[in-house]
Amino acid sequence: MALPIVAIIGRPNVGKSTLVNRLAGEQTAIVHDEPGVTRDRTYMPAFWNGREFLVVDTGGLVFNDDTEFLPLIRQQAMTALAEACAAIFVVDGQTGPTSADQEIAEWMRQQRVPVLLAVNKCESPDQGLMQAAEFWELGLGEPYPISAIHGSGTGELLDELVNHIPAVEDIPETNEIKVAIVGRPNVGKSSLLNAFVGEERAIVSPISGTTRDAIDTVIERDGQTYRLIDTAGIRKKKHIEYGTEFFSINRAFKAIRRADVVLLVLDAVDGVTEQDQKLAGRIIEEGRACIIVVNKWDAVEKDSYTIYDYEKTLQSRLHFTEWAETIFVSALSGQRVEKILELVKTAAESHKRRVSTSVINEVLTDAVSWHSPPASRGGRQGKIYYGTQVSSQPPTIALFVNDSKRFNDNYRRYIERQFRQQLGFKGTPIILLWRSKKVRDAEIGNVNRATRVKLS
């Protein structure tokens, strides 16, 4: 059963995101002294007096301006309100009621959900009561004076809110796969998200950077739940100004860190850029599973060699992610978009997979019999005593050898390929830890001969 939803509504820069962060108990929505910082619907879990619910942060509502993406923001806010069981209308107690507040209040009175009026920026309790009293004229009932930044007054607001929230009992835990969607600005990340969801969930605009928060959306396919995290586009450092974009990029990096699988979205027209390479490096650094999604494939002129040539370019420019699955899609038309989730599920399973020590050593025995470890100039050969998986997410295998320095990069890559080919680790990095160990220590530490690597 889904959690009930509470929509946070208001004009720009009244403190909606600050209130969401207060209710959710963490800074997730981007807060900055700039109107219009929040553009998409951002869902965060909250809890009060035994009731669980989701608070939805929306963009600032402006009814009399159709420039840029303001009509899209209105659509997002309206969609959030349509799925909510209650709404909090946030106003600015320091400025008093405005014509924009009046317009929103008139619209809110026409909605089916109960509306609570939160008068924010009431930092002084005594003055706050007087500031809040001015908002009775909006016709939405009792105004609640609060300070979202300090937390004062929010308890009374929440006490009333939970009266309008249905209790959620026995919510089943979902075995969800967390998927971060990352890439440079304007490569089609939000369009891809919308193609998954089937609605305009994230704002899509040709204006670069229309997504600023890391936004969570939960979908289900064939009994599997996926949490999709759309993120702000990541640009080169020299193009980043301190402010909302700086915080957005930090959000994107955090999204990579908490994801099971990362979709690295590339622009088929632009090809692989230096920034794409750096993003891929960040994904590897965090040890995440990865799918390379080449978007806008419909915009590329093709012949029978196009996809082959593009794959060669990927192998050359992103050679360190050769283990990642690649798919060519069009988020705009939906071409092959659903196939992405199949690859995600496989990669997530590989990412958390554990393999028994006996199976690992069977693979090593075969690998050594096919290709012996290299020998040093003095004729001393490298020996692999045994291997064992020490962790997952990503799969990490410790290999105990006589001298790790005797195994060059080529042989190490060969062993990794053998694990992938024989154990099916698709879409996930594998970490091999080469540990030098004296012969006697290896024998003592590996009493079970069934797990010993047979050396030819």
Curated annotation (Swiss-Prot):
- Per UniProt, residues of the EngA-type G domain are 4-169, 177-352
Q: Does the keyword Manganese apply?
A: no
Positions binding GTP 1 in this chain are 10-17, 57-61, 120-123
Name of the molecule in the record:
GTPase Der
Which UniProt keywords are present, listed alphabetically? GTP-binding, Nucleotide-binding, Repeat, Ribosome biogenesis
One GO molecular function term? GTP binding
User: What range(s) does the KH-like domain occupy?
Assistant: 353-438
Record-annotated residues binding GTP 2?
183-190, 230-234, 295-298
> Which source organism does the UniProt entry give?
Nostoc punctiforme (strain ATCC 29133 / PCC 73102)
Q: Does the keyword Repeat apply?
A: yes
What this chain does, per the entry, is described as: GTPase that plays an essential role in the late steps of ribosome biogenesis.
